[in-house]
Amino acid sequence: MYNPIGSAEAREPAELPAAVAAELERLEGRLRQLAGAEARRHLAVLGEAGAARVLRAVAESRRVRTLPGFIKYLAKREAAITRRDARGVPTALSAPAFISGPSREEESVYTQLFDNEVQMYDQSPSNEMATSLSNHGMVEVGSPNQQMPFHLHGNGGSVRQIARLVPQLAQLTVESPCGHTSSVSQNQGCIEVGTPTQAMVSPGLNQMALPCRCMPSGLQNYIEIDSPIQPMISTPRRVSTPSSVQDISRLIENMAGPSVSPPSPITAMPQNPTTTCHTTDNALREAASPQMLALEELGFRKIFMVFAYLASEKIENVLSVDYIRSLKFLSMAQFESQIWRTFGHKYIAASDRAKNLDSDPGMTKVYHCNVAIRGDTVVKIFKGPYIENTRTHLQKVVGDDNVLVVKFMGKLSDTKTDFSTYCEHYHKVAEDGIVLGLRRYRFFVYKDGGKEEKLKQEKIEDKNKCTSPVMCYFVRTESGWNMDEPYILSGRTVGQARELFMHISSAPTLAKYMARFALILSKTITWDADLSAVYVRRIKDEPCMDRHGNVVHKDQEPLIHTDGTGLVSVDLALNCPTSIFKGKFLKPQPLLMQFRLFYNGSAVKGTVLVDRRLPPATILIRPSMVKIETHPELSGVRSVNSSEIVSARNAKKSLSGVQSVNSFEIVSTSNRPRRTLTSRFLITLLCYGGVPEEYFLELLQSAIEGAENACYDYEDALRIAFSYADMEDSMSARMILSGIPLEESYLQHRLDFMAQQERKGIKQGKIPIDECYYLMDTTDPTGTLRPNEVCVILENGQFSGDVLVYKHPGLHFGDIHVLKATYIRDLEKEYVGYAKYAILFPISGPRSLADEMANSDFDGDIYWVSKNPKLLEHFKPSEPWVQAIKPKKTKQKKPQDCNESKLERLLFHEFLKTRFTPSFALGTAADSWLAYMDRLLTDSLDEIEKKLIEEKMLKLVDLYYLALDAPKTGNKVNIPSDLMVKQYPHFMGRSFSYHSSSILGQIYDKAEDVESLRSCNVQPIGVSLLPCFMEREAPPAARHLWQHRYEEYLTDSTMLYRAMVDKEERNMKFQELYEKYKHMLYDASEFEQTQRDPDDVFSEACVIYQIVYEKARWSNDASRCGFAWKVAGRALCHFYALKNEGDTALCSLPLLR
């Protein structure tokens, strides 16, 4: 058996008698400590009886700080007593010393046990007095008026403990008070009880007749009793003690001598025995195997890894209890290596091995489970945990390990799988939950991939693919492990658990129920503010009004200007994290924050704008921002901040009284605009509005030249490196800025790759364009802007002049507006301060500008804003969009109409429908619209045909916008066949196509020609070594270590490339692989956080460079150099800058962009 600690001798623990081993195992489980090999050897030396007395003393102790030390202490005292007994020293003199235990109070045993003779009295109904020798106890065995005294030797244990000390059961006949006899066969697995007269002794004793009122003093160490409650008692091989035996034991213990509570005689079993249980009382634990119970000592991350490596194998068939316990004290890296060698390699691919084992404890750990149908069964494969830098609100409240991201896989087959097949198999999974060890996870929430992911999904022709952007989340609701308590969801149904986040039961429809509840899945940063001290107040929405001052209505609902916008006081804004982009903090302080507010059961979504007029600690929200209202009957429940939940969970404090969790979660903030690109929709709308094609061809030529020059020109190289910075941690930009020449092999390889990506984007109409910006939206706090005016705040403050404004993915001819950017006096001084980058819309006029553009609002959407003079010169706007097609009103199911079990089934069924029968209306409408637009821009159409096409396009626009909102409204959207095109332009890459000469067709052809020309003349990038890194020497031990690690990486990466996993999962695993080796190099997440000596880090980084590049030079393939830069890149850049440039300056990469 593998043991990571101790000497060679300690790695072979002493063998204990089965009963002693079983009792020790029980104590280890109860105390959550391992005794260790040395303590076991001490017990083995004592013999069975002495070891039993020691373990009883441990069990009687109120607190045990260190189990191994306590056992060794008691074992030495027991051995001393035994030696004194052998010399004839009275045991009464030694007993108090033995039982006193260590001097520390928490490890003291307060129960004194006396070896001298003490008479215990039990008044029987016949008024007879029963007497026995020292420390005897009496238990009724046959008749209510007759007792049998049981002699408990010296400091011997209670029946609860002593009942386990019978390794083998000898044949024994005992005379009962009524004259009956009973026998028990030797070595039987279970002992039948219930007969009035049964007692068992060790094989070492002879069979004997026993008087009904006394037991010979020789019957001292081995004893079992019968229970009038349970029909069967397991043999000593069983780990846990039957509850009825525990009850008898507890009562007998009170007779053993003076203790914490005074002794009392026993005349009968209590009517309702109370079981003192140290474990969670549920079905999972009751049916648990010893292996499942032993897992608790490992901690959840190790437990998860065990089940991930077992795949679908049963733990009982693979692992022993001793082996599981031997893993407890291993580091994560040692643990992973051990279980991989022992069993993991048999059941999972090497590419599925856990990576990044020593990650920062503060990083998010995402646990995955893939559920798939194989034949007639459903299998569950656990994967991860994967490391991320942001958390959802759900993960923060319940904890990372209590959330499972579950992927329900489609069947791989040539024929389409019927939806009923998925329902038949997967509904059962939702009903039973997903069991992981002694934990049960149940369906909680799901979320589709959003607009972009929907469009991507619909581009894939294979409708029966295995993966999906629809994400399903299960949460842990039950556990049989003590380590899992206290837990905030304990004792709650799934419905009650959801109410912690928001009073979702008040959702008006079933469709809105899950769409609103999915707000807890946004990746957010928690605003560290005490919401109990914050004044959250509602203010009215600003209505749209006509020229006569009347409120404008649509479908009997008033139109509003301020849909999704709120305000926040300056002091709270200053406490907000600095600007956020993709979970990373940027500077300076933001002007706008997109957020989710969970407050006293309500759920609020939108943006807040800094407003200096507000008193401190104030947040103003509007009715349009409130997605779920506080339930009137639950408005007075106890609410706590989410930060308090985290603190209480870490401190293992009870969370059972919490009824609602308050939290202000920041999704994103207004940031400096990044490089702006066009899109196919935007180009066609601009051309339709009069912008000449030649202008876009000029932009195209400039973009192609920039991509071509990226490998040779520093300016173009830095521009393209920053454009793709998120792809590789800005490593190419770091290399360039540190002075590494563009000719460096790996840098050339990366620049060439980014240029290829640039050309692919160009083919799709993604062309860089100057003087255009993407800005977050809100409304004018001053109320001074007119209906056609906006306020645009850029780098240098407010901009004045005409601008084009568009909201992606708008398709209507009038979705691009020409507006006047207007200066608002004293805006910075009296209202928003001097933060930047936003567009403010007016709150005047008969209709909101956001509603006119793609049916939008102001809850954090990003708008395209252009002050490009060429576009402004030629573009002529069209009339704004007005909805013509109204959605068909369908009867919506309400959550309030269902009981909880029916509601859960309906919600999961909706998930299955979203997952396996998705609507393709969105993609169909967009593709048909683009094909019609292509005809408008190329063909010489007469007015009648042009008008007919435009009418079809307007209908498609309405259906497209309806399909965007379908998940929230619950409306079904179908595209009529007469609106679908039969042929598509060639640049769309569809099967039935024609060659288009439109601007999009020309852009595609030009980029395609360049790509073809390059592929014919491509030259492989050779591998050359920079002397700066080759001259640095490192100790041979370091070189040997990293040589080994690199070979290990090559093996793992090869497996990853061969693994049958989707691209997202493969990228995630590669990232974890690199993080693992970075941590080995830096002892931290990054070079900037390392506590190691910089010289040592530089030496090892150069060794990594040398090993990797020398191997890559053999194949002359620069793509094989990536490991050096992905692992040691930051250290190498720093070293190069110091070595070659001398003086350096600290610079902000976002600022350089």
Curated annotation (Swiss-Prot):
The keyword RNA-binding applies. The lineage of its organism: Eukaryota, Viridiplantae, Streptophyta, Embryophyta, Tracheophyta. Pfam families: RdRP. Probably involved in the RNA silencing pathway and required for the generation of small interfering RNAs (siRNAs). The gene is RDR3. GO terms for biological process: siRNA processing. It is an enzyme of class 2 (transferase). It comes from the Eukaryota. GO terms for cellular component: nuclear RNA-directed RNA polymerase complex. Belongs to the RdRP family. Keywords: Nucleotidyltransferase, RNA-binding, RNA-directed RNA polymerase, RNA-mediated gene silencing, Transferase. Its EC number is 2.7.7.48. Coiled coil: none annotated. Expressed in shoot apical meristem (SAM) and panicles. It comes from Oryza sativa subsp. japonica (Rice). It catalyses: RNA(n) + a ribonucleoside 5'-triphosphate = RNA(n+1) + diphosphate. The keyword Nucleotidyltransferase applies. GO terms for molecular function: RNA binding; RNA-directed RNA polymerase activity. Transmembrane segments: none annotated. This is Probable RNA-dependent RNA polymerase 3.
